[in-house]
Regions:
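ABC-family P-loop ATPase nucleotide-binding domain
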Residues: 1-25, 233-235
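ABC family nucleotide-binding domain
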Residues: 15-17, 22-227
């Protein structure tokens, strides 16, 4: 792709997430280790995209770079029109707070807070006066209207992940990053969680970026990006 075409793609307003020549290297006792090399991609608003690959292929590293959780050694990433490589950590955190939601394999709920209080957290940090009302509404959407006052220890694994999903969606993010979101769940519960994620993806047009080792799960996405030894290869 010519440089002018790449620039046009990076400036396309329908593209919510883009990378150009992303690379990540780390030092090791054996020398410099390349975790990612020359990764370029674009993801449009409302798409669901799976990032797949073997363990150690660089999936979670790519997610961290695209979300601004880590800095690349080379290349750049643009999220919702913001060039992350030109921002410091505070600037990247501000972009994440405004445009991104996260769901991980571990639920990362605050054990001393109820379901509704966990979901309210990002809204309270943003000083939203309607935090409780908005949290209650999104908990209803994920099927937990009757569990808003329960603590994480009183919820099943699937219910805890639903709370995490509600927290991720409550600020209506442009992009939801999900890193092995069913990894701690049994197969039946995991399928229900993914039904919920894909349903919210379609209903809200929030872009879903899913890191998974499960090819059947990846096949449910609009598109698959496969990594092999830190490089994008045909899927």
């Amino acid at each position: 792709m010519a440089a002018s075409e790449k620039q046009a793609l990076m400036n396309d307003t329908t593209v919510v997430l883009a990378a150009e020549g992303l690379g990540k290297q780390v030092s090791s006792p054996e020398g410099t280790l390349a975790i990612l090399a020359d990764v370029s991609l674009s993801i449009r608003r409302g798409e669901s995209v799976a990032i797949i690959g073997a363990s150690g292929a660089g999936k979670s590293t790519l997610l961290a770079l695209l979300a601004g959780l880590d800095e690349p050694t080379s290349g750049r990433a643009v999220l919702a029109g913001n060039d992350l490589t030109r921002l410091d950590e505070d600037g990247r955190a501000a972009v994440r707070a405004s445009h991104v939601g996260f769901v991980f394999q571990s639920f990362h709920l605050v054990p001393s807070l109820t379901a509704i209080e966990n979901v309210m957290l990002p809204l309270e940090l943003a000083r939203r006066p309607d935090a409780r009302e908005a949290a209650r509404e999104v908990l209803g959407r994920v099927g937990l209207a009757e569990r808003v006052g329960h603590y994480p220890r009183q919820l099943s694994g699937g219910e805890q992940q639903r709370v995490a999903i509600a927290r991720a969606f409550v600020r209506q993010p442009d992009v939801l990053f999900a890193d092995e979101p069913t990894g701690n769940l049994d197969a039946a519960t995991g399928e229900k969680i993914m039904d919920l994620l894909f349903g919210l993806n379609r209903a809200t047009q929030t872009t879903l970026v899913l890191v998974t080792h499960d090819r059947q799960l990846a096949a449910r996405c609009d598109r698959i990006i496969r990594l092999e030894a830190g490089r994008v290869v045909p899927s």
